[in-house]
């Protein structure tokens, strides 16, 4: 890759200091003063870069690696050439995340779209809105009547903050996002194009065969340290609240229906759909393209495999997969049995396809 001007190199941190900051042990103390300026993948890392390895699959890439250090565990350290210093840790993935945050802190939240700071010309701030000192609003953003925004928060170009919305401190509302009927905590990141607080999908049968819209008069509550991906949609509650718990991370293109309650520190991957009034416990992980039926409960610490369909409650701590989702051991056993029967049937037909 040519020089990446989107994320310029760090001015430099001592390798020894980096090791201390990420909780790793440096294999060669003689290089502790070497400066580290950035992160890079193994195959193109150069002097001044730090990279990481989680498996032996990258072994061949070590031949071209010129990194100043590799973050890895003991099992991987045994295959790293002696010319490359090792930052030894039991949790290399976590250590690399910490290193990246130190070296490229500006990449932890969406970047500024203009060089302007403060309230930019072209932004519309309703006279009744209240903004603490240090709020930044980019051109073409709209802040509605009675909205309140905490210090250190950035409202990017084209974002819309609806009337009476509350946004805490040190948040980022990215370009083109819209926030309506919502209370948002501190250190929340909303990525471009996300839609928060629009009305949920609720209709009743009409007297003449049509559909009558059910009013949605609830709110969305997003707690501290939540991150919501681009083009994700979170509907407000019908009469209650839709809640996203503290520290939860939601990928791009996720749909969260009205009255859903998601616990703390969950991870929800792209294209997941969660229907209205579902309950998601703390620490739940949901793989990409999974669907969660309305009014179901997923217990604390449960894991849902990608492309699964959750039609009924999932107990705490369980791993479920398949359609309909069931205990992973049962699902995998069924898949293996179907594959075996298919193979036997194919052999009986002399290897000929139907």
From Swiss-Prot:
CDD domains: LbH_LpxD. InterPro entries: Hexapep, Hexapep_transf_CS, LpxD, Trimer_LpxA-like_sf, UDP_GlcNAc_AcTrfase_non-rep. It catalyses: a UDP-3-O-[(3R)-3-hydroxyacyl]-alpha-D-glucosamine + a (3R)-hydroxyacyl-[ACP] = a UDP-2-N,3-O-bis[(3R)-3-hydroxyacyl]-alpha-D-glucosamine + holo-[ACP] + H(+). It is an enzyme of class 2 (transferase). Pathway: Bacterial outer membrane biogenesis; LPS lipid A biosynthesis. Keywords: Acyltransferase, Lipid A biosynthesis, Lipid biosynthesis, Lipid metabolism, Repeat, Transferase. Pfam families: Hexapep, LpxD. One of its GO terms (molecular function) is N-acyltransferase activity. The keyword Nucleotide-binding does not apply. The active site is at residue 258. One of its GO terms (biological process) is lipid A biosynthetic process. One of its GO terms (cellular component) is membrane. Its EC number is 2.3.1.191. Belongs to the transferase hexapeptide repeat family. LpxD subfamily. PANTHER family: UDP-3-O-ACYLGLUCOSAMINE N-ACYLTRANSFERASE, UDP-3-O-ACYLGLUCOSAMINE N-ACYLTRANSFERASE 1, MITOCHONDRIAL-RELATED. Catalyzes the N-acylation of UDP-3-O-acylglucosamine using 3-hydroxyacyl-ACP as the acyl donor. Is involved in the biosynthesis of lipid A, a phosphorylated glycolipid that anchors the lipopolysaccharide to the outer membrane of the cell. Homotrimer. This is UDP-3-O-acylglucosamine N-acyltransferase. It comes from Sinorhizobium fredii (strain NBRC 101917 / NGR234).
């Amino acid at each position: 890759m040519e020089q990446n001007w989107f994320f310029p190199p760090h001015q430099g941190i001592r390798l020894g200091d980096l090791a201390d900051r990420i909780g790793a042990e440096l294999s060669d103390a003689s290089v502790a003063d070497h400066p580290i300026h950035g992160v890079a993948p193994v195959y193109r890392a150069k002097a001044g870069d730090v990279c990481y390895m989680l498996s032996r699959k990258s072994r061949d890439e070590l031949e071209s690696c010129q990194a100043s250090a590799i973050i890895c565990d003991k099992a991987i350290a045994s295959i790293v050439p002696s010319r490359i210093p090792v930052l030894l840790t039991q949790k290399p993935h976590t250590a690399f995340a910490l290193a990246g945050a130190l070296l490229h802190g500006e990449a932890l939240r969406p970047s500024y779209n203009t060089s302007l700071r403060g309230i930019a010309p072209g932004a519309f701030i309703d006279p009744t809105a209240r903004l603490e000192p240090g709020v930044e609003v980019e051109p073409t953003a709209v802040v509605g009547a009675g909205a309140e925004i905490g210090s250190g928060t950035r409202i990017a170009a084209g974002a819309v903050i609806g009337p009476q919305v509350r946004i805490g401190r040190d948040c980022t509302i990215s370009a083109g996002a819209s926030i309506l009927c919502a209370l948002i905590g501190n250190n929340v990141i909303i990525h471009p194009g996300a839609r928060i607080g629009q009305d949920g999908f609720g209709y009743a049968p009409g007297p003449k065969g049509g559909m009558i819209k059910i009013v949605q008069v609830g709110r969305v509550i997003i707690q501290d340290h939540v991150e919501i991906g681009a083009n994700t949609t979170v509907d407000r509650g019908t009469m209650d609240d839709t809640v996203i718990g503290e520290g939860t991370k939601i990928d791009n293109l996720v749909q969260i229906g009205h009255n859903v309650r998601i616990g703390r520190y969950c991870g929800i991957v792209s294209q997941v759909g969660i229907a209205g009034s579902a309950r998601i416990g703390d620490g739940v992980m949901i793989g990409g393209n999974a669907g969660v039926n309305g009014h179901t409960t997923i217990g604390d610490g449960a894991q849902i495999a990608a492309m699964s369909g959750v039609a009924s409650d999932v107990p705490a701590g369980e791993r479920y997969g398949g359609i309909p989702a069931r205990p992973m051991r049962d699902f995998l056993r069924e898949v293996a049995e179907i594959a075996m029967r298919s193979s036997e049937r194919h052999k009986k037909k002399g290897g000929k396809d139907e």
